[in-house]
Amino acid sequence: RFALLIPDNKTGVAVARAAVKSAQKNGVKITRIGFYTPGTTDFSDITKQMSDYNARTGRLQNLKNSLKAKVNAGDANAAKVLARLNKTDTLGDVDFDTVLIPESGAGLKAAVAMFGYYDVFSPQVKFLGTSVWENTRLNRESTLIGSWYPAMSRTHNAYFNKKYHALFNEYPQSLYAFAYDAVALASALARNNPADIDAAITTGDGFVGISGMFRILPDGKNEHSLDIIEVTRSGDVVVDPAAKKFSAALPENSPESAAQAYDAVPPMIFGKNKSEAERLIFGRTLAGNYDYGAPADGQDNGGGYGFSF
């Protein structure tokens, strides 16, 4: 179950659309989407809402009140549970296991810190990023240890960077590799002179570029094999290297099929009008109402006193 914390702009909407399609293809659900003002470093309100902090503290207080009554009646076991509860701030889990935050710098650090303030921590909840996380020394932030983000193949990029530096005595910008690959692909196609240029360009096998495998899809979009990077205390580590070949292309989901998948139980929207957000992300408003089975205040969650250790 995924939550998205995205900027309220075209980039944020693009990330949300891509996340919805990917989630549908991989059989997972997006349960919450929060929008924030681009450039802000104040995430206190949006993270508090997304983490159900008031409801979770309310459940805790209700349980404490119930236990106090039992303690006053002489229940020794209730006293032990109450003592443990006094060391916690909330009761109950959030309805997501992962949060995607396409933000970097001070904004990213502030957002993750506020999630922690409202009792949403790693490793119980994993934080994910986009390629904007690269080269930002995230291992200095203890709250981000264990987080993941994608990046261009470091093995391929290291070779390109070394060759470029040897020629120009400086390191290339990230876009330079794409330009190199585009020229190399055009050159290869010109040499081979294929009878069907469109079929040659959109071959499912793709091409080996200077920054890894890539392929061009019939609709003009492209796919690129990426490393998955984990933030560790000693630095960023590749935990899943970029694929050396592509698997069969998955059929592209239509916007309507994505909308239908969420009609029964749509994601909760924070920081933006619900209908407007749904139209931007899904192409139309969704039919259903929120219901992710969150326990009601004071509901017994186990352990005989609504709490387990």
Predicted regions and their residues:
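Extracytosolic ligand-binding ectodomains
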Residues: 1-309
